[in-house]
Swiss-Prot record:
GO biological process: methylglyoxal catabolic process to D-lactate via S-lactoyl-glutathione
Species of origin: Arabidopsis thaliana
The keyword Membrane is annotated on this UniProt entry: no
Names of required cofactors: Fe(2+); Zn(2+); Fe(3+)
InterPro entries associated with the record: Clx_II_MBL, HAGH_C, Hydroxyacylglutathione_Hdrlase, Metallo-B-lactamas, RibonucZ/Hydroxyglut_hydro
Membership in a protein family: Belongs to the metallo-beta-lactamase superfamily. Glyoxalase II family.
SMART domains linked to this entry: Lactamase_B (SM00849)
Record-given protein name: Hydroxyacylglutathione hydrolase cytoplasmic
Amino acid sequence: MKIFHVPCLQDNYSYLIIDESTGDAAVVDPVDPEKVIASAEKHQAKIKFVLTTHHHWDHAGGNEKIKQLVPDIKVYGGSLDKVKGCTDAVDNGDKLTLGQDINILALHTPCHTKGHISYYVNGKEGENPAVFTGDTLFVAGCGKFFEGTAEQMYQSLCVTLAALPKPTQVYCGHEYTVKNLEFALTVEPNNGKIQQKLAWARQQRQADLPTIPSTLEEELETNPFMRVDKPEIQEKLGCKSPIDTMREVRNKKDQWRG
């Protein structure tokens, strides 16, 4: 399995997932279809289907166009989201196969949108796990609670995604990492892992390189939204429960002007 970034718009990422045995490919959130198709051609891959994380235009806005450009392509999207151009709806636990060797598991991760899907991808033997989290989980952050609650985001981040293997690579929908880590330091100023990752992320961006992927293990160490069960964070924010802490961290992030 190979995964390639396709930078789009101002700070979006689409992704190309290639099964090396067959050259078959899936694309995640191809908002700029021409760019994604060019990447597939460069890597001599054949696009078979689209994995849409959620209905927002900067993720699903290229679906109709890619259907025109790639005959017989399938477009997957969450059954509870009104995904533009969707041909096949998926629900939590649905399984797909790409080529000969890649398994894909749909995970319902609502809150940013009510039907948001994250896609957990690995090889036939479970090797090289990766998860495409759209705007639910960012590196050191999470999406705004546009269509859901703190309870839902807690379930999505701290139960559903946190249960994946720790080496799982995290591929999210936007390059927000530096700002997210700067905010994370306001929550945990003495967290050395956050300090180290922020220094690295700044270097990456100065070199015009992506900060993605992260890993689930790194997120559990540095992402304040995945650390809301930590007593020291709850105490600092004056909260009594992980869900209250999730709500408070989101409120602080929404008001933060770093």
